[in-house]
């Protein structure tokens, strides 16, 4: 009986498996922070963070969705009159290009511990 709960538990604890992917979006900026907003990506798109560099000036970044075929590419881009070399670094997963959330790992661990405790309790009751 306990094994019947396992698939349900996996579905509840596995976020981002619905096929819908949101990514963080922010315009090109020379700021070190890019909190951005959420945007919905297409089926053939991945989240990305673009890092741009140019001699004698600070770096630029942008974030959003991009076709998977554009991942890892480097291209020239003009920002504030300066030509930067912008590299697109992609990731897969819901909001994976956002800033790391230090509480996310602790919350997932607490949820997994609680679920395991419930399963063990059910095993002894049944």
Curated annotation (Swiss-Prot):
A lipid is attached at residue 97 (GPI-anchor amidated asparagine). Residues 1-19 form the signal peptide. Disulfide bonds join 23-47, 26-34, 41-65, 71-90, 91-96. InterPro entries: LY6_UPA_recep-like, Snake_toxin-like_sf, SPACA4/Bouncer. This is Sperm acrosome membrane-associated protein 4. The gene is SPACA4. Keywords: Cell adhesion, Cell membrane, Cytoplasmic vesicle, Disulfide bond, Fertilization, Glycoprotein, GPI-anchor, Lipoprotein, Membrane, Signal. The keyword Aminoacyl-tRNA synthetase does not apply. It holds the Pfam family UPAR_LY6. Residues 98-126 form a propeptide. It comes from Bos taurus (Bovine). Sperm surface membrane protein that is essential for effective sperm-zona pellucida binding and penetration during fertilization. It is a lipid-anchor; GPI-anchor. GO terms for cellular component: inner acrosomal membrane; membrane; outer acrosomal membrane; plasma membrane; side of membrane. Residues 23-97 form the UPAR/Ly6 domain.
């Amino acid at each position: 009986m306990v094994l019947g709960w396992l698939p349900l538990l996996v579905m509840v604890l596995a976020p981002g498996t619905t096929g819908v992917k949101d990514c963080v979006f922010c315009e090109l900026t020379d700021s070190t922070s890019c909190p951005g907003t959420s945007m919905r990506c297409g089926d053939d798109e991945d989240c990305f963070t673009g890092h741009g560099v140019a001699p004698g000036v600070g770096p630029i970044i942008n974030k959003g969705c991009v076709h998977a075929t554009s991942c890892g590419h480097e291209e020239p881009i003009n920002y504030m009159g300066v030509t930067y070399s912008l590299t697109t670094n992609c990731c897969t997963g819901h909001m994976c290009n956002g800033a790391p959330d230090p509480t996310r790992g602790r919350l997932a661990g607490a949820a997994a511990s609680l679920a395991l405790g419930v399963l063990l309790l059910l095993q002894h009751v049944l």
